[in-house]
Amino acid sequence: MTATLKKPPIYKVLYFQVLTAVVIGVLLGHFYPSLGVDMKPFGDAFIKGIKMLIAPIIFCTVVLGIAGMEDMKKVGKTGGLALLYFEIVSTIALMVGLVVVNVLQPGAGMNIDPASLDTKGIAAYTGPGKMGTTTEFLLNIIPSSAVDAFAKGEILQVLFIAILFGFALHKFGGRGTMVFDLIEKTSHVLFDMIAIIMKFAPIGAFGAMAFTIGKYGIGSLFSLGKLMGSFYLTCLLFVFIVLGIIARLNGFNIFKFVRYIKEELLIVLGTSSSESVLPRMMEKMELLGAKKACVGLVIPTGYSFNLDGTSIYLTMAAVFIAQATNTPMTLLQEVTLLAVLLLTSKGAAGVTGSGFIVLAATLSAVGDVPVAGLAIILGIDRFMSEARALTNLVGNGVATIVVAKWTGELDQKQLTRALNRDDWIEAQEPEMILDHQQDKMR
């Protein structure tokens, strides 16, 4: 047993491979921009490979979790507490962004005339139909057909189907039935497929980063460096102070948690999409002691309702545009902006570019800030996407552990052991460790 738990050489560890790939991608994109842009298919292929399995993995995980539960009341309790947590923490994130941007004022002194801006680049984000109403968003959770939900990879629609299927399967016997066993075996196969695809994560991160630097250039980072610096600083403060306090109150350390998911963070840094590690995060949250049913409900739901990084970005970007264009905003107008963002931010999925679409829709709805001002930040939005995705990922991970503890679905001893023994966690693939733990339980 000691041999199987031996820590592998550094060059075989995924986070080292991804970090190296990201650095190489940055260098290639900077010194050979055209070649860097040509590397885009590598990043796209990796993300598509992960996305093709997200829907079936969510379905299997949620169905197994719900159908295998003894007390079905816990499902409703878990969902209710998760939504309550999402709303509270998202509101805090919006407020933190609003406070910091008013204190640092990164847009002050730019004196940009909105009429002089070239708005052709933002037309794709501000066109009609890009952002639906709240009613349309809620109705869209119900798919037109089950096949359509899986074909399009709509996370909330798949989650809706999985919850219904899980309840129905529980009614007909749940654990021990042939259908349950089939779904359980299918789940193992799907996670094995994810493990295979994750071997190519360094190549995907390299391609995505080389493209980003090659297309937009490092120079674009400096032109609006104050906004980027303020945003990255705010995200760090939110993660290590706000989420840090929440973590401490619930019995774990945020620094150890971030270290625990460092591989996933590096992959997200390279791809700018938190969806690229969704299946792996579900595995790792189970390894921390959260039960499958809780993980299956909280993680997928959080990808639409608990986007802390996107929330920070939305308030900071909106007020920054107002400052840069010398558009005065009263306290009432900022509170109104906050209230509108509480609704519109829920429509931002965990994919690249969604935050910009939501920002465009919000500015159009509020009317106080010129929508043309979006052209100011269009060039650096891709670089800010990394911080959004990273903060979203940490936020959803913390939310899962917190909700699991609130509902009594967390093994505190396993949580402590996993966070304190990262060498044991890194020694093997997550699915191998899960199998090892299940064998011990038997």
Swiss-Prot record:
Keyword terms of this UniProt record: Cell membrane, Membrane, Symport, Transmembrane, Transmembrane helix, Transport
Primary gene name: dctA
InterPro entries the record matches: C4_dicarb_transport, Na-dicarboxylate_symporter, Na-dicarboxylate_symporter_CS, Na:dicarbo_symporter_sf
Subcellular localization: Cell membrane
TM annotation in the entry: 13-33, 49-69, 81-101, 149-169, 193-213, 227-247, 312-332, 336-356, 357-377
Entry similarity comment: Belongs to the dicarboxylate/amino acid:cation symporter (DAACS) (TC 2.A.23) family.
Source organism, top-level taxon: Bacteria
Pfam families on file: SDF
Organism (species): Polynucleobacter asymbioticus (strain DSM 18221 / CIP 109841 / QLW-P1DMWA-1)
Protein name: C4-dicarboxylate transport protein
Signal peptide as annotated in the record: none
Biological function: Responsible for the transport of dicarboxylates such as succinate, fumarate, and malate across the membrane.
Main location: membrane
